[in-house]
Amino acid sequence: KSLEKDNKIFFLSADFGAAALDDLRKRFSSNFLHCGISEQAMLDIASGLALEGNKVFVYAMAPFLSLRSIEQTKCGAGLMNLPICLISVGVGLGYADSGPTHYSTEDYACFRAIVGSSIFTPADIFSTKLIAKDILSNPKFSYIRLDRDNLPDIHPKITQNDFNEGFKIYGKIEKKKIALISHGKMLHSC
């Protein structure tokens, strides 16, 4: 919906097979750039677009968006404080069936080490939409970690204010001395 109102939003992708992007690719072809399997170049393109005043979203598989292009991310989005939002899919062992080259267990540490980064690991579609709304309203260098699977909504009653201030205790706690702290997909198990 945001692309319908703002032609200064660009979406870059390194993922050839993401059927979820088909509609976006067709409807907004002038704002959708397919960069091929070239994550490093894609981050350089993103930096150039951001330097021209655009809001840039970059999408790729987690292990390649993080480790493969970390220097470009650090120098562009990080050191120049550019409004680039990185969206990775298949975090953790999301693509374990593809072997260890597709594991993404270091991505959080990589981006946490870059000055000015904001890292988000949504647990469902609802919280993902809140994160996107926040980033579109306040463009900044950010990293969104998505699971490979579509996760059912776990907390559809949260508001933008809850998101901005942090989440509270869910459920009833009766004199128990236990705390479960989680995020992303694992929140469903808690």
Task: Give the role of each language-model region.
Residues 1-145, 150-151, 160-163:
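Thiamine diphosphate
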